[in-house]
Amino acid sequence: MSQTPLVTEAEITAEGLKPQEYTEIVRRLGRHPNRAELGMFGVMWSEHCCYKNSRLLLKQFPTQGPRVLVGPGENAGVVDLGDGLRLAFKIESHNHPSAIEPFQGAATGVGGILRDIFTMGARPIALLNALRFGDLKEAKTQQLVKGVVAGIAHYGNCVGVPTVGGEVYFDPCYAGNPLVNAMALGLMETPEIVKSAASGIGNPVLYVGSTTGRDGMGGASFASAELTDESMSDRPAVQVGDPFVEKCLIEACLEAFQTGAVVAAQDMGAAGLTCSTSEMAAKGGVGIELDLDKVPVREQGMVPYEFLLSESQERMLFVAAQGREAELIEIFQRWGLQAVVVGRVIAEPLVRVLYRGEVAAEVPARALAEETPLYERECPKEPPAYVQQARQWSVDQLPLPARSPAEILLTLLATPSIASKAWVYRQYDHEVQNNTLVFPGDGDAAVIRLRGTAKGIAATVDCPSRYVYLDPYEGGKAAVAEAARNLSCVGAEPLAVTDNLNFGSPETPVGYWQLANACRGLAEACRALQTPVTGGNVSLYNETIDSNGQPQPIYPTPVVGMVGLIADLQRVVGQGWRATGDAIYLLGLPLTTPLSDPRLSLGGSEYLAQIHGLVAGCPPQIDLDLEQRVQAVCRYGIQQGWIASAHDLSEGGLAVALAESCLSGQRGATIQLPEGTYPRWDALLFAEGGARILVSVPPREQVAWEAYAQAQLPNAWTRLGVVNGEDTELCIDSCNNSPLIRVTIKELDLAWRSPLPKYLD
């Protein structure tokens, strides 16, 4: 083997490898790698595949719990729902591909996350997505939104999996680097959970699914780099998906897993054949010999480098029980899919690649998949300058706006991040499979029926990214708390988390400070709320290079996907008022809380950003003890049948939450603010903070409800008013009975429904 370099410095750099990493590769191999081997290391040592900058931080996440069956390290996490039911779930990002080719980038993001689910032996039952875009007034943003939403809709609708929920936010920081995070859930259909560790020396290795082409070349390395003008034309790095092939692949895989002939399975996602062979071999402590001449192709003249790095979609790798490969091949051929023996499990712990009868690459499996670089960076002790400057702002510097409270409420409802997302979710089929009980826009979380039982599951994705930007630690806590609160608002007990960490470069002090502190906040909140992390995704280098050559990172955006269990589907509520005469209560921090209390703040609020054009101040601190108690009271009230509706207070504070419940229920509300409230009406109506939920309760339940609330939440519940009738108005009066807001449902509706169609139709 060669002792002189077989590749150029330019080729090393093009693979995303640093000089010291190349030196380490040479040391590990005892020789210089050839071009194919360099490509294998390039993708497997990318941040996207090996988490070299984040793995040490992820170790602080709690990963075990009484319901956790599979934690981090497999294709998806799995939790026990009781009665023999098991739920697989996972979130993944497809940010960089979606920036380049929005339709295919988003579509293949959906396809990839679905494969993670059914590779475990679970049938996909639901999809959610968390999307971030730039300023909606910009033509480029409009093009991205249309492409991404169409791609998600196309793939999910064609494959027959409902898209049941998600979130969409707009901020200029995402202009050049949108975020497309897709989450999927599935119910286990196989007796045993299908794992990915190869075993059984001599067992055949099967390639199943679609053919291999040059699409998606080096996608994992591409996903670990900053976006530049050059990379924006890098379309070969974007995969092309076929949802109809994926649908056949789902059915064929689930049928194959039922036979017991599959020893291990791995989907070919990022890094394609390289990742699937090296991960399966490394996890099993064995090796895999792969013959590229047997791989089904869709393009001629492909060389080993292209075979190994292709990210063509809808492909899987199996290890089969020896002698049973024909049985599996028959199943896949019956579904119209490729199925070929392309290799075997070997005792030497290597990935050995054959091409035209010769060894084209030979690399220790653990060097690619387990013993990858790990960077321990020093986290700055002092917050960066932008945070220190933001913390100097105080509410005393803020003049009361000249506009009326009603005008400001309507303005906030018309901001794209708060406005109705019906334009988005009406393109998704959220009813296919006929198990969706709470539709997008109707509740704080999606609810899916578990057929044959009285149970349901709820799911949500959340991240207050402006909070995380201003205070990553509190923002990380807030992301977990809001996800759990949203589940609690439909009556679900939060079970577990899958996280998607979208950040800028960890190689800058600011970037690493944001990442490290957000992880600390996420970990603390997950422990406090008893929602272990079962896996997830890290997407770093979400930056665009501006015209001056300077990287412009996104807001740090750790999206929390959370699942919950509903014991009785008869006890599920939405966010809209249900009946005239129902009393309206605020759970959590009372409106008499002084603005000096750090748990309530205009800092980092939607009001401050949209009305005053300021991103400043300290976001609200999360009181995890109060959060637990408020959520538990809300869940119990729903389970007892006392609560008719529940909605958490998030962007826009009290006034926006009241308006959203009016809009969802198409009923008005009469609100009388209690005595002793703070004097600033803007803070009273629009300040934000955790652990706050609006609930409505029918008259016949109010005595029992109030007794329970007082016992469990003394001084942390407030009766605010009453639901006042269909198609009426939202009336909010101050404590001295002077009217603050009088807005009809029609006015609210017009402001809230118009923004997205205005820019996107």
Swiss-Prot record:
GO terms for biological process: 'de novo' IMP biosynthetic process. CDD domains: PurL_repeat1, PurL_repeat2. Pathway: Purine metabolism; IMP biosynthesis via de novo pathway; 5-amino-1-(5-phospho-D-ribosyl)imidazole from N(2)-formyl-N(1)-(5-phospho-D-ribosyl)glycinamide: step 1/2. Mg(2+) 2 binds at D116, D267. Its EC number is 6.3.5.3. Substrate binds at S93, H94, N95, H96, R115, Q239, E311, S312, Q313, S539. ATP binds at Y51, K90, D499, G536. InterPro entries: PRibForGlyAmidine_synth_PurL (IPR010074), PurL_linker (IPR041609), PurM-like_C_dom (IPR010918), PurM-like_C_sf (IPR036676), PurM-like_N (IPR016188), PurM-like_N_sf (IPR036921). Mg(2+) 1 binds at E92, N537. Part of the phosphoribosylformylglycinamidine synthase complex involved in the purines biosynthetic pathway. Catalyzes the ATP-dependent conversion of formylglycinamide ribonucleotide (FGAR) and glutamine to yield formylglycinamidine ribonucleotide (FGAM) and glutamate. The FGAM synthase complex is composed of three subunits. PurQ produces an ammonia molecule by converting glutamine to glutamate. PurL transfers the ammonia molecule to FGAR to form FGAM in an ATP-dependent manner. Belongs to the FGAMS family. This is Phosphoribosylformylglycinamidine synthase subunit PurL. It comes from Thermosynechococcus vestitus (strain NIES-2133 / IAM M-273 / BP-1). The gene is purL.
